[in-house]
Amino acid sequence: MDAIKKKMQMLKLDKENALDRAEQAEADKKGAEDKSKQLEDELVALQKKLKGTEDELDKYSEALKDAQEKLELSDKKATDAEGDVASLNRRIQLVEEELDRAQERLSTALQKLEEAEKAADESERGMKVIENRALKDEEKMELQEIQLKEAKHIAEEADRKYEEVARKLVIIEGDLERAEERAELSESKCAELEEELKTVTNNLKSLEAQAEKYSQKEDKYEEEIKVLTDKLKEAETRAEFAERTVAKLEKSIDDLEDELYAQKLKYKAISEELDHALNDMTSI
């Protein structure tokens, strides 16, 4: 664009110079005409006064001839100058048209740039909204991780209490042979519980694979944690009840040991599942 403007300025300068030369040629022409007229007047006067002086007549005739040649030369220069001016005018017109087209392209480019900047602003606002949502999801995940840790702590506490009960029952382990058949039934129930916990694990892994849809499954996930927490609280209550009934174990050793064995396996599996769930949450 600057090169075009410089070129246009140079062409305008050439035009002005050509106009100056044309004006100078016109002035020379006028001067020659004036001088020719003066010479003609003088020649007429001399012819009237010196009709017999051929030398003077030849002299002035030569001067008149020179003046006419200068006049013709001036006319030619003026014609050439006018042609140069016309050519420069055409070139200036072409440059101005080219400048108009360049300005039109520049205007189009500026309009496209403005549209691109608007689109970039919209994209930036969308990114900020996504970042805010991701931050909220992360905060919810941290809260649920804390809830899982609390549930694990409850499970560990339940295990500890059951271990204490088990130590108290070591002295009567010899009487627990009849509990084997019932233990098999308990193992079957534990297998069912294991399948249930595997389902929970699969749900947690599914949540990890579908992190972008986490907010939609958040209620279900919290409900699962609540169910596990309720089960652990129920187990803790049963453990406390079992501890209070240690004095009566001699009368109901078979039933109590069956319950103890089943509950111990059950809550050991729950504790392991909570560890897996916590690890899954940590890796999300």
Swiss-Prot record:
Region: Disordered, residue numbers: 1-38
GO molecular function: actin filament binding; identical protein binding; protein heterodimerization activity; protein homodimerization activity
PROSITE patterns recorded: TROPOMYOSIN (PS00326)
SUPFAM superfamilies attached to this UniProt entry: Tropomyosin
A GO CC term assigned to this protein in UniProt: cytoplasm
UniProt keyword Coiled coil present: yes
Role this protein plays: Binds to actin filaments in muscle and non-muscle cells. Plays a central role, in association with the troponin complex, in the calcium dependent regulation of vertebrate striated muscle contraction. Smooth muscle contraction is regulated by interaction with caldesmon. In non-muscle cells is implicated in stabilizing cytoskeleton actin filaments.
The protein's name in its UniProt record: Tropomyosin alpha-1 chain
